[in-house]
UniProtKB/Swiss-Prot annotation:
Binds water, Ca(2+), Na(+), K(+), fatty acids, hormones, bilirubin and drugs. Its main function is the regulation of the colloidal osmotic pressure of blood. Belongs to the ALB/AFP/VDB family. Residues 19-24 form a propeptide. The keyword Disulfide bond applies. It holds the Pfam family Serum_albumin. CDD domains: ALBUMIN. It is found in: Secreted. It comes from Xenopus laevis (African clawed frog). Cu cation binds at H30. Residues 1-18 form the signal peptide. This is Albumin A. GO terms for cellular component: blood microparticle; cytoplasm.
Amino acid sequence: MKWITLICLLISSTLIESRIIFKRDTDVDHHKHIADMYNLLTERTFKGLTLAIVSQNLQKCSLEELSKLVNEINDFAKSCTGNDKTPECEKPIGTLFYDKLCADPKVGVNYEWSKECCSKQDPERAQCFRAHRVFEHNPVRPKPEETCALFKEHPDDLLSAFIHEEARNHPDLYPPAVLLLTQQYGKLVEHCCEEEDKDKCFAEKMKELMKHSHSIEDKQKHFCWIVNNYPERVIKALNLARVSHRYPKPDFKLAHKFTEETTHFIKDCCHGDMFECMTERLELSEHTCQHKDELSTKLEKCCNLPLLERTYCIVTLENDDVPAELSKPITEFTEDPHVCEKYAENKSFLEISPWQSQETPELSEQFLLQSAKEYESLLNKCCFSDNPPECYKDGADRFMNEAKERFAYLKQNCDILHEHGEYLFENELLIRYTKKMPQVSDETLIGIAHQMADIGEHCCAVPENQRMPCAEGDLTILIGKMCERQKKTFINNHVAHCCTDSYSGMRSCFTALGPDEDYVPPPVTDDTFHFDDKICTANDKEKQHIKQKFLVKLIKVSPKLEKNHIDEWLLEFLKMVQKCCTADEHQPCFDTEKPVLIEHCQKLHP
């Protein structure tokens, strides 16, 4: 595992001027043409991607209508691969695609706004189409019996219908991801149609598939959030950390090349240039396999797969084993008297070999970025002091202690989860975050706590050396979504600081937040709590939700309550529920007991 060298590489990557990487089509115009994409893929895959893209742009059109357009585009693409290609074939694929849409008279009839879009020139035309996409998550799925019958008779029709529904309901989802999900859906259908209880199988497996879909979409949106809200050095540093984690073998030059190419295609994706994005992603897979021997011992299995499957395999590939010869002690970077001389030469450490230890658990990319920032600050301070080695000699201890603290905090949370279970762990998170952000709505706070508990359930179950990357990576995505929703008006100054100060420190900033001292709790009145007999007939999940709403209300009116007092009042609440739900008349009992509970709560109110 690499710590300090990755930190040094992250610093250098932000200071090195971006250079030309793997050769593009031409130095003047690197836009891809339709024949390029067609030649990269099989015809089946090309048509699948085209269907996904037209479904994202023309969301109201039926599958039958779009299939005709897909066939026209496919036929044209095929003609562009031959000797008789027309000048149109040389247009950038994005331009050609929107030319085809605008030339279809049905588009103008069904989409009135398209007339305005089609009057524009690219890239404004493409931006106009994207601006009119509607975000609705209401896919139409056939019943299990119908699905199995269609899959048996016409499997391609079923999979095309899935592409259409998934793409039009997720108009910004990376189109190859739509095809990946379609492939997984096909395997799901094949499996469930063999099961006796098809309804149960489809319900469970589709839930898993949709969770995977949302995870892919969340990660894609998170990258774009970084691109749109932080300097480019942040996304580059994050990509370099990821490349260096996955491929510990290559030298910095090769790692930096892959970082640059990855950053380039992510920016194209986030700016809406989906065609450039797709072809660059596929080309990156090609380049990865061309350098597989230099990169990783584990790439062989991916590079033997078809291109689309190969890309997903590479993205999800486990980290390669760290070569033993790369290990160097951390003291090389904090006790070397010549560190400042090396830093002054080019503000980077290109020749330093990685320091790593296979016995030490993996660190998260967020930790590496934050440490890089702190290490850079340390050198900028110490290298201008009277005695630089004396100034930076404690740097190793600082990094080690911070890492130990993070591992300890993660272990503490996993221990709570394992000891008390997900629901009580969720309540623990609910208490923490209600105190940090009491201005947030009850339902939103409950939703955040539930998602955090899900992350804990997942990440605490992985091997220990994967826990920090898992937990901090997923939590950073969740917190980023929360910050994005609040960016126009933050709910308090402390949240605003965490969301806008530093990407790498965002998660740790939220963790360190205490109760919002500026918050003035509302008075406790008859309207503060609402109890009715619905809780007596609710199922277990509904009862848990009602209890959590009471918990949030309690914290909001008494944010300084200690944990033991919170537990005490939750117990009082449960006693009231038990008493009233066993009474002959439920609601009169709640009406009688409510003032007693409120009176106690008022005594706790500051």
